[in-house]
Amino acid sequence: MGKTVTLTAGHSNTDPGAVNGSDREADLAQDMRNIVAAILRDDYGLTVKTDGEGKGNMPLRDAVKLIRGSDVAIEFHTNAAANKTATGIEALSTPKNKRWCQVLGKAVAKKTGWKLRGEDGFKPDNAGQHSRLAYAQAGGIVFEPFFISNDTDLALFKTTKWGICRAIADAIAMELGATKV
């Protein structure tokens, strides 16, 4: 079928991103990348480029180079806020990826009941504290399916991680027109 998906994990072993107790954004992002990549490869036979395997990932300057030639490129993150009750799903990108952002957000919302932030899950990459995110400017999507700072959302993610990742992978495959192999 010739479709290529790029999946990357935000942050790294040297930059943990947001932290809640012993849970680090970098680790959760790597888990999401690894699970979604495995489902897309094993169940749909799609070509998946990643910025690493297991607990490794590339620096952002190298990860953005993977985007070229991809049908969709997604970098996994978690959201965080000082307000521990902040919740919701958002995907940040340029307007050309608005539909993809909404597809991803709706898949997670359907699985979890979490609300969609922005325009049905889409936010421009210069929204809020952000300003022209490098990954989005290179053609990718920065996907934040939940708030690591919200204890309830974090607990739900940890207990339903595989189901959430399955929903994301199935939505990607459906949007690309891929069928199970």
Predicted features, each with a name:
Residues 34-45, 68, 105, 109-113, ...:
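Sec-exported extracytoplasmic/periplasmic mature domains
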Residues 46-53, 115-122, 180-181:
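Surface-exposed patches in mature extracellular/periplasmic domains of secreted proteins
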